[in-house]
């Protein structure tokens, strides 16, 4: 498949916390959709090795959720570092989208971009500077059409691939119910 500048890159990161100055990325996943939000490619889902010290510094919420999902065990067992995760992800993306073409797509992608900028700059640079943030649409719908909110429920698994799939489904829902296009 030839790279298409109209395709969209969807990304989700799982981190040890919310502060890029002290927390680290522990999982990354990407999907590519066409401009109609049809999934056309799934990138690698990568648990990124971090030290026991980094994992032990996680707060209770992260320990609980990432422990219950099995992510902490996957991170400990992983042999993949951040640079390798970046290289694998970019190798996937190059098949579908030229560098600099796609906005960063997902939920609360401003947070993901902060971590990419700090630890995975080459991957952050692969995206256009714009964001397609589903959470922005959600905030608008919550205020302007609150009854519409009841029609879409997220699982909130805090697993990168499932979170991206839900973000795409959520935008498809808003497109059909709010934008009607």
Curated annotation (Swiss-Prot):
Documented EC number(s): 3.1.15.-
SMART domains listed in its UniProt record: EXOIII
Major subcellular site: cytoplasm
Catalytic residues (positions): 129
Any one GO CC term of the record: cytoplasm
Compartment(s) of residence: Cytoplasm
Keyword annotations of the record: Cytoplasm, Exonuclease, Hydrolase, Nuclease
UniProt keyword annotation of Cytoplasm present: yes
CDD domains linked to this entry: Orn
Biological process, per Gene Ontology: DNA metabolic process
Chain ranges of the Exonuclease domain: 8-171
Gene3D superfamilies with a match to the protein in the record: Ribonuclease H-like superfamily/Ribonuclease H
NCBIfam families: PRK05359.1
Stored HAMAP family: Oligoribonuclease
Function (record text): 3'-to-5' exoribonuclease specific for small oligoribonucleotides.
Family: Belongs to the oligoribonuclease family.
Protein name: Oligoribonuclease
Natural source organism: Shewanella sp. (strain MR-4)
């Amino acid at each position: 498949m030839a790279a298409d500048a109209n395709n969209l890159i969807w990304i989700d990161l799982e981190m040890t916390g919310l502060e890029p100055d002290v927390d680290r990325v522990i999982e990354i996943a990407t999907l590519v959709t066409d401009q109609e939000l049809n999934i056309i490619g799934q990138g690698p889902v990568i648990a990124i090795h971090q030290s026991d010290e980094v994992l032990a510094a996680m707060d209770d919420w992260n320990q609980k959720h990432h422990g219950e999902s099995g992510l902490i065990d996957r991170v400990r067992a992983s042999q993949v570092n951040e640079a390798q995760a970046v290289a694998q992800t970019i190798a996937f993306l190059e098949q579908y989208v030229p560098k600099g073409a796609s906005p960063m797509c997902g939920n609360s992608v401003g947070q993901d971009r902060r971590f990419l900028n700090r630890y995975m700059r080459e991957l952050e640079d692969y995206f256009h500077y714009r964001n397609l943030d589903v959470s922005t649409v959600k905030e608008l719908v919550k205020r302007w059409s609150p009854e519409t909110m009841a029609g879409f429920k997220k699982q909130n698994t805090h697993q990168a691939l499932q979170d991206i799939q839900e973000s795409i489904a959520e935008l498809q829902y808003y497109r059909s119910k709010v934008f009607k296009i």
